């Protein structure tokens, strides 16, 4: 049953990437400029989605494996969740074994971090965001909170940091861009 589920999730991630790169719905002739942030979900289901999205990204689009531009992918790095210095040292001791899943790590998603690095090397995405950087931290973030994503920074597109809020709680939920503006000076 689990193999069937993995196959279905993989096919869903392939479809997601395909649709984000082919559905023309912006002004009738552009694909949706889309972004997805991930890397901190440690549930079995969340890990499966992340892993299959990374695999589908490496496979690329079509029979030639064209690198997908969308969605812009951002892998969130959080100490103790998707990274630890001890795990880094352990992975560097036997990198091939680490990449093959033969090394035990402390951080539950460190293996996904390694796979994200491999994916970036082959397909340019995901980008990486460090949640422990002082200006990206949220005082309410707690590793034991199943809804900790409410207190995680997110980015949209190539560069828009969605987090701070002048008129309410600091969160990335329910926030986004309505329009872009270009100024030629």
Segments predicted by a language model, with ranges:
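Conserved catalytic cores of very large enzyme subunits
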Residues: 1-185
């Amino acid at each position: 049953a689990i193999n069937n589920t993995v196959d279905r999730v993989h096919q869903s991630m392939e479809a997601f990437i395909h649709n984000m790169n082919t559905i023309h719905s912006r002004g009738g002739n552009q694909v949706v400029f889309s972004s997805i942030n991930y890397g901190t979900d440690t549930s079995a289901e969340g890990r499966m989605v992340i892993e299959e999205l990374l695999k589908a990204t490496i496979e690329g689009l079509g029979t030639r494996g064209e690198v997908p531009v969308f969605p812009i992918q951002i892998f969130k790095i959080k100490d103790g969740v998707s990274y630890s210095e001890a795990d880094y040292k352990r992975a560097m001791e036997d990198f091939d074994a680490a990449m093959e899943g033969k090394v035990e790590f402390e951080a539950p998603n460190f293996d996904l971090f390694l796979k994200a690095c491999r994916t970036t090397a082959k397909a340019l995405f995901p980008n990486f965001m460090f949640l422990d950087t002082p200006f990206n931290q949220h005082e309410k973030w707690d590793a034991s909170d199943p809804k900790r994503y409410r207190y995680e920074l997110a980015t949209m597109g190539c560069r828009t940091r969605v987090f701070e809020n002048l008129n309410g709680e600091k969160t990335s939920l329910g926030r986004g861009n309505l329009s872009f503006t270009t100024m030629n000076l």
